[in-house]
Amino acid sequence: MKKRIIAAILVGMMIQSYSCKDSSEKKILTKEVTFTKEGELTLKKATTDSVVARLDIEFATSEYETQTGLMYRKSMQPNRGMLFIFENESQRSFYMKNTEFALDIIYFNSAYKIVSIQKNAKPFDKSSLPSQAPAKYVLEVNAGQSDIWGIEAGDVIEFSKNSE
């Protein structure tokens, strides 16, 4: 009888310590980041110089901004994008960690020409999505937009920053 009481007390203590442990672990919630228009970007066909799209854009220039990109956002309107600006032209590779919606990732060289496009990058995918040539600028837009616009390697961008 005493053994059963002791066993019951031990089981009760284990259950209580386990339940206390669970309640002390807090889930960290991240607040969704909202879009802030910081400039405008125009995509043009290289062969005709015709405008295929005009976008409101956010810039990613700091290390934090380039590491975070469009993470923790639920969606983005089709006329928006994020332009990553790097100090030099180099091989680039992006991934979709913590990115909740599919993207087209468009790589540009220092002459503002498309060098490659990674289409329909899957949400939360940690696979490497490299440029096919050195890039200085990278534009992230909603998946499928590059096909809708009919852009390809050699097409160009122009962009401007809002005056502060």
Task: Give short role names for the model-derived ranges.
Residues 15-19:
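C-terminal motif of bacterial Sec signal peptides marking the signal peptidase cleavage site
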Residues 1-2:
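N-terminal secretory signal peptides that target proteins for export/translocation
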Residues 5-13:
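Sec-dependent N-terminal signal peptides
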Residues 21-164:
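Compact, glycine-rich, soluble single-domain proteins
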